[in-house]
Amino acid sequence: MGLSIGIVGATGQVGQVMRTLLDERDFPASAVRFFASARSQGRKLAFRGQEIEVEDAETADPSGLDIALFSAGSAMSKVQAPRFAAAGVTVIDNSSAWRKDPDVPLVVSEVNFERDAHRRPKGIIANPNCTTMAAMPVLKVLHDEARLVRLVVSSYQAVSGSGLAGVAELAEQARAVIGGAEQLVYDGGALEFPPPNTYVAPIAFNVVPLAGSLVDDGSGETDEDQKLRFESRKILGIPDLLVSGTCVRVPVFTGHSLSINAEFAQPLSPERARELLDGATGVQLVDVPTPLAAAGVDESLVGRIRRDPGVPDGRGLALFVSGDNLRKGAALNTIQIAELLTADL
């Protein structure tokens, strides 16, 4: 017997991928309902040969649902996730609204589902940030072998992580200047870009070392930098893990990448790391990971694994990870958690 599933934010970028994956993975759903904001109410979305009418998430009655997959932003999740949970629905939330709540497990399906997901006093499970997500299946394997103590990370985050607005901004700017792009070889001001709205500087043919928003705490960090630290600690179960991150937006449509320098308590050679990662769940070992290769792939791609000479005693590794921020980074992990929950419901 199947479960009754709802997608809140079904008309959005991640919601679209969720709908596709539910079908592709033959999720055991006896009934499916789609929810979004009031402006999408009444719109019809195709699913498994049916036309399903979108409901207003703020006014719809969630009774009868077993699981609701939320990807409608933090403001919606803060209000509606508890309302759905109060109706007996298990909520899996893709926003940042609940990640820091000590009573809400923050789960990556391959990493900490068994340890954390069965205890959910608020009826909510949080999905991590897409940048953190790409690294977790890789780092968990290495942590189990040699105990992770420190991470220094630079991220290379695709514009789809900013939603449809980020995608549109990159495409518009690239189209506007592509005819004379060679002029930028010698002078970054040689061409006039359409004014940026989503980012603080043009994103086409550029990188912007400020992904997210600056946090008003004197640290000089963005919320993306801080998510990387907090979420890595919570997911891996290492509360004292040292994490320094610089999150950068790059002119890539889909696929977040991370350059990682990892320090361990015990020696760990590149050869042993490759042996551990080859065939690990949620991981694909490759020579040169790229975001283009990762787009549309379920696993995190990891490669360029080498000794970090800045860490003594063979306790440091440098590596590069790429992952699809819309697929595993958001929609897929949510659905994998739902699949694992079927045994509980």
From Swiss-Prot:
Q: According to the UniProt entry, what is the EC number of this protein?
A: 1.2.1.11
Q: Which residues bind substrate?
A: Q157, R249
- Pathway it belongs to? Amino-acid biosynthesis; L-lysine biosynthesis via DAP pathway; (S)-tetrahydrodipicolinate from L-aspartate: step 2/4; Amino-acid biosynthesis; L-methionine biosynthesis via de novo pathway; L-homoserine from L-aspartate: step 2/3; Amino-acid biosynthesis; L-threonine biosynthesis; L-threonine from L-aspartate: step 2/5
User: In which residues is NADP(+) bound?
Assistant: T11, G12, Q13, V14, R39, S40, S160, G161, N325
Q: What happens when the gene is disrupted?
A: Deletion of this gene inhibits bacterial growth. The mutant cells lose an average of 77.8% of their cell wall materials, exhibit altered morphology, and have a reduced capacity to infect macrophages.
What are the alphabetically sorted keywords of the record?
A: Amino-acid biosynthesis, Diaminopimelate biosynthesis, Lysine biosynthesis, Methionine biosynthesis, NADP, Oxidoreductase, Threonine biosynthesis, Virulence
* InterPro entries linked: Asp-semialdehyde_DH_CS, Asp_semialdehyde_DH, Asp_semialdehyde_DH_beta, NAD(P)-bd_dom_sf, Semialdehyde_DH_NAD-bd, Semialdhyde_DH_dimer_dom
Provide the active-site residues from the annotation.
Answer: C130, H256
The record's Gene Ontology biological-process terms are: 'de novo' L-methionine biosynthetic process; diaminopimelate biosynthetic process; isoleucine biosynthetic process; lysine biosynthetic process via diaminopimelate; threonine biosynthetic process
Keyword presence, Oxidoreductase: yes
Q: Which reaction does it catalyse?
A: L-aspartate 4-semialdehyde + phosphate + NADP(+) = 4-phospho-L-aspartate + NADPH + H(+)
What SMART domains does the record tag this protein with? Answer: Semialdhyde_dh
- UniProt-annotated binding residues for phosphate: R99, K227
Q: Name one GO molecular function term.
A: NAD binding
The question of whether NADP is a record keyword is answered with yes
The role this protein plays is: Catalyzes the NADPH-dependent formation of L-aspartate-semialdehyde (L-ASA) by the reductive dephosphorylation of L-aspartyl-4-phosphate. Is essential for the growth and pathogenicity of M.tuberculosis, and for the generation of the bacterial cell wall.
Assembly and oligomerization? Homodimer.
| PANTHER family, A to Z | ASPARTATE-SEMIALDEHYDE DEHYDROGENASE (PTHR46278:SF2), DEHYDROGENASE, PUTATIVE-RELATED (PTHR46278)
Family assignment? Belongs to the aspartate-semialdehyde dehydrogenase family.
| Protein name, entry field | Aspartate-semialdehyde dehydrogenase
The source organism is Mycobacterium tuberculosis (strain ATCC 25618 / H37Rv)
